[in-house]
């Protein structure tokens, strides 16, 4: 095991990998409850949605560990599942959920081809170092914001958009406890501190009524959503994937999902890489091609399984911060997904308040890259700023990256330095511009 996963070579241990895997799993475990809810809204049976979510995540997370040997876990991506449910199935498009999964699968196939041709890595290499740092910083703010919002520390406001929540509420109290424990253990350099904070906050939440207790157990698996793109649409004789080509307008959604997957993963991998010590100070990720290959295949597998697009999870950074350095942590995460396909109510006990501390600390750790940006050089600093602000403020990693790319190209153009912009940056920026226009 040590030789295969290079555990000692990367100054890790089996214990660190297990703790890192547990931390990552708990930080991303909300997807077990959230994704099926989204897919049920789209018309999929709950049991099928739960099985697809857990088994799809397990397969691709383990594949990432075995093939790329990096602590990068995968599951159904937030954002794309919302597009599937509320735009494709319930919005004006109003297609059957099987057709939506066919669109997701096609998007994954296209990305896989682009990665195989080296285009995705080439785009990453074309991104200026300042923007690579900005992506990680923006994601850090995004993660911290998600933690604070989910924990009731920050709440929505009609007058000011956001405001301070009721800190005397049980939800906020558990969140504050989680943050305090996570920060204190980080200061004391306690291994597995983030995991300890999640478990401790979950226990504290029981008497306060914040931690939901299991009321029933689901021991069955339902694979009826698997091969969804090749299933016949109810009431017709048409296979779902054929319907996509019978309605050419649906191919625009293939492009839209592709843009989101393409750049979300780039930002996530850089962010996790810097926490897991496999990305350098300029955001260049070591041995990135296998990571991108598995991630691109995951999108297609997600559509095939009926789980929506499966993608790398930025919550993997919490596991990396807890000590994960190899793919062994992915094996832990993958096996836990399989287990909780049967025992989903247990994961339901981990509330957003319990994970608040881990997400806030990870967000803090990711802000350290601010020091690597030359803030005196506005040609590079402003695009970085646009990216950093755009990610949390639009609740989208893709949008933030798009703001950074487009502003960088425009600034270099008007200052007469267009020749310094690499061709793929022009292409990517134009693609983002098209995406924003069509949105």
Residue ranges and their predicted role:
Residues 18, 38, 123, 192, ...:
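Residue-level signature of catalytic and energy-coupling elements of molecular machines
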Residues 1-48, 162-164, 196-289, 433-434:
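Helix-loop-helix hairpins and the membrane-proximal interhelical loops
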Residues 42-62:
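Loop-to-helix transition at the N-terminal end of transmembrane alpha-helices
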Residues 2-35, 56, 77-139, 272-370:
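Helix-loop-helix junctions within the multi-pass membrane cores of secondary transporters/permeases
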Residues 51, 102-105, 255, 293, ...:
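Internal alpha-helical transmembrane segments of multi-pass membrane proteins, especially GPCRs
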Residues 60-72, 183-189, 256-264, 295-305, ...:
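Transmembrane alpha-helix interface/packing and boundary motifs in multi-pass membrane proteins
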Residues 93-207, 211, 331-439:
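Membrane-embedded alpha-helical modules
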